[in-house]
UniProtKB/Swiss-Prot annotation:
PANTHER family: FCS-LIKE ZINC FINGER 14, OS02G0174800 PROTEIN. It comes from Arabidopsis thaliana. The lineage of its organism: Eukaryota, Viridiplantae, Streptophyta, Embryophyta, Tracheophyta. It is found in: Cytoplasm; Nucleus. Residues 85-94 have a biased composition (Polar residues). The keyword Magnesium does not apply. Belongs to the FLZ family. This is FCS-Like Zinc finger 14. PROSITE patterns: ZF_FLZ. The gene is FLZ14. A zinc finger (FLZ-type) spans 181-224. It comes from the Eukaryota. GO terms for cellular component: cytoplasm; nucleus.
Length: 248
């Protein structure tokens, strides 16, 4: 007659797999070690289950692991915290919302303007004093001469401050104009050339009209012809002496 053999190795195998912290899973091992061997043992198991019903078979420190998750949690308890895959938690009202690093709700135009000024590398502060009351107004302008209103500036809102009027400023006083002295007046009639068309001859003579330039060109050509005739005249050539004997 064959009898059923019990399996006492179940407890030992489980103990080897989990052999890190036996005290944590002690109730679990108690159930495994007391496997039923006779019909009378079935009456003992309910008592054990009732005795351990108030205890949880997993520790909260193991991240809520159940079943085989206890083995993995015990093996990694010294390194990191394991959480169950299917674990769901309700929304906890005690948790705080994420911190908002940038909040534009409470910012004002003055703060934006100050931030814009700090970002500018080159800027100019212009302070205007109004009368004997002592009140003053300060404006900020960038390196291009535009007034800084706020951090968000459109091109149509900009207002240029440093503008040079080339019409009202006399070009005769500028150093560039002083270096070009021949452009001040006509070379022939000495008429002022400011604001008029200028006709250049040979890059160094300026004239007020084509007539003056043509007259000067004609005079230069006449002088050139005279010099050429004078250089080829026999009277201006050197004396020629022939070798010979003077007989008296």
């Amino acid at each position: 007659m064959l009898t059923k053999r019990t399996h006492p190795m179940i407890g030992k195998i489980s103990e080897l797999l989990v052999g890190v912290n036996r005290s944590t899973a002690a109730p679990f091992f108690d159930v495994l070690m007391t496997s039923p061997k006779s019909p009378l043992d079935f009456k003992i198991l309910p008592q054990i289950s009732q005795r351990n019903s108030s205890k949880r078979f997993y520790d909260d420190n193991l991240g809520g692991s159940v079943g085989l998750g206890i083995v993995a949690a015990l093996e990694n308890s010294n390194t990191r915290r394991i959480t169950s895959v299917c674990r769901s938690e309700p929304n906890q009202p005690g948790r705080s919302d994420p911190v908002q690093f940038m909040s534009h709700g409470g910012s004002t135009d003055g703060e934006d303007e100050e931030m814009f000024i700090m970002d500018e590398e080159d800027y100019t502060l212009v302070t205007c004093h109004h009368g004997p009351s002592g009140s003053c107004n300060t404006r900020v302008y960038d390196k291009d001469g535009f007034e800084c209103f706020s951090s968000k500036i459109n091109d149509d809102r900009r207002e240029r401050l440093f503008v040079v009027d080339v019409v009202t400023e006399s070009p005769e006083n500028s150093p560039e104009f002083q270096g070009l002295g021949f452009l001040n007046s006509c070379y022939l009639c000495r008429k002022k050339l400011h604001g008029q068309d200028i006709f250049i001859y040979r890059g160094e003579k300026a004239f007020c009209s084509t007539e003056c330039r043509s007259s000067h060109i004609a005079n230069d050509e006449r002088k050139e012809r005279c010099r050429s005739k004078f250089s080829t005249s026999p009277y201006t050539a050197g004396q020629i002496f022939s070798t010979g004997v003077l007989v008296t």
